[in-house]
């Protein structure tokens, strides 16, 4: 049984330190530290290498009863692959948690800068039961480490008179040690009270701080259950507990009502059902069930069952409310138990999704878990989000059934990052990207052509109502005046010019504040003039597109409006005709139309398209002549989507995306690409780059291993962004495992080498399919695979190697992501058998004589060691074995000696020799095959005296090849010949049979007993033992006759009676006397003679007077008198007759 060790005692600071000086109590904030101790003997180091994850191990502490204890430890997060799981234990296996009580609290914090985890254990108001050995365990994936410490609980400090120092108080409420006056009222107690407290304290020390109900449970439990109960209730001082129980010497009372009680505790998962069963001694006893002292009534949740003497309570669909104490009551007896309802692990049903939002948007990050009302922890960039900080950070939590939502009402740039949700059964994470809000133009400004004194209205609409802006005319800001009005209503911005004048003509621009955006339109002033030109003038086209090129060219963006205003002159006014190639345009309405004015011809395209690109010709004619001009219209557009988008390689949290440039660049060279990513099944795309990426290969990072993703690409040119490409096939970031660990050589022969290793430290979501082993000759760089298919176990034997060569070996892990980094031996291995001297490992049961019965199998397995394979030889008495009876099979590690049916001839000494060249080892095995012995011989009755007989015999001729253990003697009467046992396992060849019956004649028989049992047949005595009768004188006893005479005596007197008139009545009494007395019945002192109303009977001294249908006249005093020669006796009673009303 393990024993908890107390904390080490502190050494005194100096030699002169007084022995009785009180120890200073450690402050609450900094518990006293004790020297570090070696771990207990039962905490032996494991075979694994130490991980060294503790920067500061918990120290053993010593604390006074009633004080608080604090234990602190620090864990190095750099040594851990993931966030660690922290567990505290008392003793070896008792885990401290929410069930441990409110006195135990746990705290955990993480410093992200240094990656150090600080964990604390707080125990409030410690009691004596808290002392003992504790253990801290840290686990993260495959990494596990633990360390132990002790908590020693001391009694409160006292002064020299035995008074507790806490009795001295100060009247002031200040925290200073010298403030106020000392108050000694706490010491004004009677001496008897102090003595009682000392006795109570001593009793508490004897009880080891264990509650009385636990002592009662231990007293009624079996010794084999002590350790189980101790671990269940956190008792670590097992030796003290056993001593206390031994002193108690309590006689366990057997329950009169229960034959089987409830177990001390039960555990069930929430939502499941559980059955509590007791067995009572009497099936007719009434039984009641109670929960926390309240009686349980039958319902659909609580079902009662009676099966024979068993009484079963079934609790259906257990909830946390069913976590309580239960008891069963039968009469005055009760038995108790406690039910613990265990919360199932909370799983992530719908994980978080990546989101990309703008500043000021409302954001809801939702996750759905498997249990309603479950506790989840939100974290941002590794830091926990709490409700206390929610007021400062502008976020709040919301629960909607199984959905947990983190809400940002007005998101800002500081809220971006990676958010994580952690439950006790899983976790998920997502990234929140916050961008500056982009302004969207909902309605652009249109060009205006107005006449004099008319009103011009420029109007635009943007996506943000709060955005303000300024108006400009030809680059000069427009100021409001009597004619000019500027308004801003919601998303609409207006510029109104009343009474338009020629100087109002120009380019008007609206520029929103804070955005690199401008909206422009042109105001054309239409002036009507009537002039008379008496002369004729040939037509002339006034066209100038660039002024610098010989060829007129115009560039328009697809989707935009194009308006070509061409001024023409001539008299009379010429007629303008527009052509595209040979096609003539004549329409004045529609998307493409012609507008005509006096001195201008306009060609309008409402929404330019790619097919509108080409050379346009305008021809003007009048009677005087004609003029022709051509314009090349180039329509530019956003490019087509990129092509052949695919994933070429993936890693643990990254993937390589490759694509081809678009077939059509939109008339402008492609300046770069934009990449987006999303989780499969999600609708939210997340931008990966905000600046255009010029290459066609992109590496995406910060991905979650084991999650399916999709990606797409946009092409960008000077015009804008293309449509998205086709989504890539779903892919999953998976990395190869890390290299295998601890590669060693286990065995080497002339042609083989056996390697062993341990699994990789990091396996990842892709798992591991197996391992590949490769070898390379020293001096060569070519690695030869030793196995084509991966092996699953962490060991492999490489065969067919050249003898004497020096070879280097390496092992790689393989999974769906590919090969891991290799684990290579530090030094080459020489392929040569390592000679090992032979050694026979004779089993313990073969080191002494091996005994078997005739007919049984002889199957001996003898292991040995030695390299190369030794030569094994079996002999018996120096001669070879008879192969017709004995079969021998030898392997590299053992030899088997087998006989199917053993015979006595197989007994003897066998020699086993194991030899390698000139080295040899031998062993001797002694085998004895036994059977039943023969019967004893010459069984004779040697002497008879009194009721005794002496029987002798000789040992059997065949002892069955085994030592005779004794003889079995029986006797039989010659008359009945029924055999009765006299002696069992009598070791001598003679015995004296006593207590034989006089006058009988006896036979005797004897069996021989050895290790196989009694002999099949007995040895029967040839003569008999006759027990003769001896002479006896009979003296009769003297007979004295007894005098049976006695005077009459009433054994049962008469009793007073009250009867109802008309119903027969009887008066009874009993009398004894010898000779038989004469009986006389009287009424009111008058003898009752032969009256038919009365019937007198006498049966064996029982006297009865029957009165037929009595009337009130029959009431009175009745007397019975009994008389014989020795005397008389009287008995009387009163009879009352009542008439019914």
Swiss-Prot record:
Gene Ontology molecular-function annotations: actin binding; structural constituent of muscle
Keyword check for Repeat: yes
Function in brief: Thick filament-associated protein located in the crossbridge region of vertebrate striated muscle a bands. In vitro it binds MHC, F-actin and native thin filaments, and modifies the activity of actin-activated myosin ATPase. It may modulate muscle contraction or may play a more structural role.
Pfam families the UniProt entry points to: fn3, I-set, THB
Domain Ig-like C2-type: 50-153, 255-344, 345-437, 438-538, 539-638, 838-932, 1048-1141
Residue ranges with Basic and acidic residues bias: 13-39
Organism the protein comes from: Homo sapiens
Cellular component terms (Gene Ontology): cytosol; M band; myosin filament
Domain of life: Eukaryota
Fibronectin type-III domain span: 641-737, 739-834, 935-1030
Family: Belongs to the immunoglobulin superfamily. MyBP family.
Region (Disordered): 1-62
InterPro entries: FN3_dom, FN3_sf, Ig-like_dom, Ig-like_dom_sf, Ig-like_fold, Ig_I-set, Ig_sub, Ig_sub2
The protein, known as: Myosin-binding protein C, fast-type
SUPFAM superfamilies cross-referenced by the UniProt entry: Fibronectin type III, Immunoglobulin
GO biological processes: cell adhesion; sarcomere organization
Keyword set, alphabetical order: Actin-binding, Cell adhesion, Immunoglobulin domain, Muscle protein, Repeat, Thick filament
């Amino acid at each position: 049984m393990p024993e908890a060790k107390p904390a080490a005692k502190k050494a005194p600071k100096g030699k002169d330190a007084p022995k009785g000086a009180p120890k200073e109590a450690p402050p609450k904030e900094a518990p006293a530290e004790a020297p570090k101790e070696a771990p207990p003997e039962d905490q032996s180091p494991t075979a694994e290498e130490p991980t060294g994850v503790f920067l500061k191990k918990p120290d053993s502490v010593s604390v006074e009863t009633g004080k608080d204890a604090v234990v602190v430890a620090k864990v190095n997060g750099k040594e851990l692959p993931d966030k660690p799981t922290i567990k505290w234990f008392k003793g070896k296996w008792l885990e401290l948690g929410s069930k441990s009580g409110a006195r135990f609290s746990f705290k955990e914090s993480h410093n992200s800068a240094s990656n150090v985890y600080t964990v604390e254990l707080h125990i409030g108001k410690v009691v004596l039961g808290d002392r003992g050995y504790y253990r801290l365990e840290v686990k993260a994936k495959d990494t596990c480490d633990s360390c132990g410490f002790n908590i020693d609980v001391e009694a409160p400090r006292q002064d020299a008179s035995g008074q507790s120092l806490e009795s001295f108080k100060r009247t002031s409420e200040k925290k200073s040690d010298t403030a106020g006056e000392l108050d000694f009222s706490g010491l004004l107690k009677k001496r008897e009270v102090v003595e009682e407290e000392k006795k109570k304290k001593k009793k508490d020390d004897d009880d080891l701080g264990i509650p009385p109900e636990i002592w009662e449970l231990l007293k009624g439990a079996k010794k084999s259950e002590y350790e189980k109960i101790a671990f269940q209730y956190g008792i670590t001082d097992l030796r003290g507990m056993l001593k206390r129980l031994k002193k108690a010497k309590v006689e366990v009372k057997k329950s009169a009502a229960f034959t089987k009680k409830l177990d001390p505790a039960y555990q069930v998962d929430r939502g499941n059902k559980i059955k509590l069963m007791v067995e009572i001694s009497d099936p007719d006893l009434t039984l009641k069930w109670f929960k926390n002292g309240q009686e349980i009534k039958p319902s659909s949740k609580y079902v009662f069952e009676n099966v024979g003497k068993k009484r079963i309570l079934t609790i259906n669909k257990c909830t946390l409310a069913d976590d309580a104490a239960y008891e069963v009551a039968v009469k005055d007896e009760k038995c108790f138990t406690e039910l613990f309802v265990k919360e199932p692990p909370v799983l992530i049903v719908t994980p978080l999704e990546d989101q990309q939002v703008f500043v000021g948007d409302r954001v809801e990050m939702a996750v759905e878990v498997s249990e309603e009302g479950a506790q989840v922890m939100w974290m941002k960039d590794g830091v926990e989000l709490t409700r206390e900080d929610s007021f400062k950070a502008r976020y709040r939590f919301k629960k909607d059934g199984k959905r947990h939502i983190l809400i940002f009402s007005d998101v800002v740039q500081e809220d971006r990052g990676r958010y994580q949700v952690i439950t006790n059964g899983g976790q998920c994470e997502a990234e929140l990207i916050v961008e500056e809000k982009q302004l969207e133009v909902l309605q652009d400004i249109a060009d205006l052509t107005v006449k004099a004194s008319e009103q011009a209205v420029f109007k635009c609409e943007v996506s943000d109502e709060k955005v303000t802006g300024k108006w400009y005319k030809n680059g000069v800001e427009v100021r409001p005046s009597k004619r000019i009005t500027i308004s801003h209503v919601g998303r609409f911005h207006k510029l109104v010019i009343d009474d338009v004048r020629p100087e109002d003509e120009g380019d008007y621009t609206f520029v929103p504040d804070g955005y690199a955006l401008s909206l422009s339109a042109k105001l054309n002033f239409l002036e009507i003039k009537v002039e008379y030109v008496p002369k004729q003038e040939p037509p002339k086209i006034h066209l100038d597109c660039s002024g610098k090129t010989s060829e007129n060219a115009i560039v328009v963006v697809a989707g935009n409006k194009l308006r070509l205003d061409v001024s023409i002159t001539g008299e009379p006014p010429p007629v303008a005709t527009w052509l595209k190639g040979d096609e003539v345009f004549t329409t004045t309405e529609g998307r493409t139309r012609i507008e005509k004015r006096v001195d201008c011809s306009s060609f309008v395209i409402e929404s330019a398209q790619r097919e509108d690109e080409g050379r346009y010709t305008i021809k003007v004619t009048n009677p005087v002549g004609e003029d022709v001009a051509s314009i090349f219209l180039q329509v530019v557009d956003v490019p087509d989507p990129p092509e052949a988008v695919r994933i070429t390689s993936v890693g643990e949290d990254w993937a390589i995306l490759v694509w081809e440039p678009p077939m059509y660049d939109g008339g402008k060279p492609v300046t770069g690409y934009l990449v987006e990513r999303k989780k499969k099944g999600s609708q939210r795309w997340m931008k990966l780059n905000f600046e255009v990426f010029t290459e066609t290969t992109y590496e995406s990072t910060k991905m979650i291993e084991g999650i399916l993703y999709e990606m797409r690409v946009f092409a960008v040119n000077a015009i804008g962004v293309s449509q998205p490409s086709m989504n890539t096939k779903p892919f999953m970031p998976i990395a190869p495992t890390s290299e295998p660990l601890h590669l060693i050589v286990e065995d080497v022969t002339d042609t083989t080498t056996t390697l062993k290793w341990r699994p990789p430290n990091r396996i990842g979501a892709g798992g591991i399919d197996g391992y590949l082993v490769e070898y390379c000759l020293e001096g060569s760089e070519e690695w030869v695979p030793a196995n084509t298919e991966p092996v699953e176990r962490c060991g492999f034997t490489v065969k067919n190697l050249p003898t004497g060569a020096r070879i280097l070996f390496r092992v790689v892990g393989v999974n769906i992501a590919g090969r891991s980094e290799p684990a290579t031996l530090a030094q080459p291995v020489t392929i040569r058998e390592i000679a090992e001297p032979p050694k026979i490992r004779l089993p313990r049961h073969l080191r002494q004589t091996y005994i078997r019965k005739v007919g049984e199998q002889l199957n001996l397995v003898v292991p040995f060691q030695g390299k190369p394979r030794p030569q094994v030889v079996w002999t018996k008495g120096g001669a070879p074995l008879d192969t017709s009876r004995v079969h021998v099979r030898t392997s590299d590690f053992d030899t088997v000696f087998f006989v199917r049916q053993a015979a006595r001839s197989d007994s003897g000494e066998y020699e086993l020799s194991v030899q390698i060249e000139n080295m040899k080892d031998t062993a001797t095995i002694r085998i004895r095959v036994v059977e039943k012995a023969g019967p004893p011989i010459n069984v004779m009755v040697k002497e008879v005296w009194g009721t005794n007989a002496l029987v002798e015999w000789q040992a059997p001729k065949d002892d069955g090849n085994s030592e005779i253990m004794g003889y079995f003697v029986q006797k039989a009467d010659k008359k009945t010949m029924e055999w009765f046992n006299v002696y069992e396992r009598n070791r001598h060849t003679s015995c004296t049979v006593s207590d034989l019956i006089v006058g009988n004649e006896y036979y005797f028989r004897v069996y021989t007993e050895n290790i196989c049992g009694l002999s099949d047949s007995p040895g029967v005595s040839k003569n008999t033992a006759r027990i003769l009768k001896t002479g006896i004188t009979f003296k009769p006893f003297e007979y004295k006759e007894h005098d049976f005479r006695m005077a009459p005596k009433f054994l049962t007197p008469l009793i007073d009676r009250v009867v109802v008139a008309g119903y027969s009545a009887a008066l009874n009494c009993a009398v004894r006397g010898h000779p038989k007395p004469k009986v006389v019945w009287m009424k009111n002192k008058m003898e009752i003679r032969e009256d038919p109303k009365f019937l007198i009977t006498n049966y064996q001294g029982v006297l009865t007077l029957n009165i037929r249908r009595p009337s009130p006249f029959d009431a009175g005093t009745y007397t019975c008198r009994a008389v014989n020669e020795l005397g008389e006796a009287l008995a009387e009673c009163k009879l009352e007759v009542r008439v019914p009303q």
